[in-house]
Design a protein with these regions (language model features):
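Gly/Ser/Thr-rich beta-alpha loop segments that engage phosphate groups in nucleotides
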Residues: 14, 24, 114, 242-244
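C-terminal target-recognition/interaction regions appended to catalytic cores
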Residues: 150-262
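Proline-centered helix-kink/hinge sites
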Residues: 14, 56, 102, 222, ...
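Class I S-adenosyl-L-methionine
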Residues: 19-185, 189
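Conserved SGNH/GDSL esterase-like catalytic core that processes O-acyl groups on lipids
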Residues: 9, 18-19
Length: 262
């Protein structure tokens, strides 16, 4: 049975840059090159291989914004060329999760349609990027365990660290958020000290980190989503490596709408 659609995330630009040296050599010898030559040894090779073998009618890939500038733009050039070589028409856009959750999280969305089916005539449109509708205070629990409050030692360290880099003209430091604003991007390393997103507290208490449940809300997961079967460390990692659920849902709905219209 034909694979109707393929959805994937994190093709991982932490892979080594795609090499074009071998491709150039083959071309100089008059030999054919293909996506396997350009992407061999990268995670994207697996994605391209699945698409090549199963020919889904459409696919939807998500990755970090820096994919477009990685390796001076060569990485995205190879990815785009590879997908077009496989005869897919592409639509791509950098979108910010803050349209759906109180978090600044820019990601590139890549949607492709099989040219043999849609002939490049699909009327796909990305969902409108709305103004932020939620603030950090909307995801916070009123009663939070004391273990999420920073110790005096850690709080002093973070302040001294930030001051040291501020004196050098660097921008490194903790992220003490405004309750009426949005947060920085949640990363998988949040479990280490929580410094990228700190919540101010009253009564002279040190700031606190988000709980795993609050992190899940920051990614758009409903409270019915279970987190109690893993440790806090693993929950933080999973949330930091995840996607903004309502954003992915909105793009997916547009993809399905386009497929049904053709």
């Amino acid at each position: 049975e034909m694979l109707r659609s393929l959805v994937g995330s994190e093709m991982c630009i932490r892979d080594r840059p795609f090499s074009i040296a071998g491709v150039s050599k083959k071309k100089s010898l008059g030999r054919e090159t293909g996506f396997k030559d350009k992407t061999q040894g990268t995670l994207f090779f697996d994605v391209a291989d699945i698409i090549s073998r199963h020919r889904p009618k459409a696919f939807f890939l998500e990755n970090v914004k820096n994919l477009m500038s990685h390796d001076k733009g060569n990485t995205f050039k190879v990815i785009k060329g590879t997908l077009e070589e496989l005869r897919y028409s592409l639509h791509y856009l950098v979108m910010d999760g803050q349209s759906y959750v109180p978090q600044h999280r820019e990601r590139i969305m890549i949607v492709g349609f099989d040219c043999d089916i849609f002939h490049g005539e699909e009327q796909f449109v990305f969902p409108e990027q709305k103004q932020k509708t939620k603030s950090i205070k909307d995801i916070l629990d009123p009663n939070i365990e004391e273990k999420y409050t920073l110790s005096d030692k850690l709080w002093n360290y973070l302040q001294n660290y930030a001051e040291k880099h501020r004196a050098k003209g660097n921008g490194f430091g903790f992220g003490l958020v405004s309750l009426d604003g949005i947060s920085r991007t949640l990363s998988a390393r949040y479990y280490k000290d929580g410094s990228e997103i700190l919540i101010p507290q009253s009564d002279g208490k040190n700031p606190r980190r988000l709980s795993p449940r609050e992190c899940a809300r920051l990614m758009g997961y409903p409270d019915e989503y279970r987190l109690n079967q893993v440790s806090d460390v693993q929950a933080y990692r999973q949330c930091g490596n995840s996607v903004v659920v309502p954003l992915i849902t909105a793009v997916s709905e547009q993809l399905i709408k386009t497929m049904l219209a053709n």
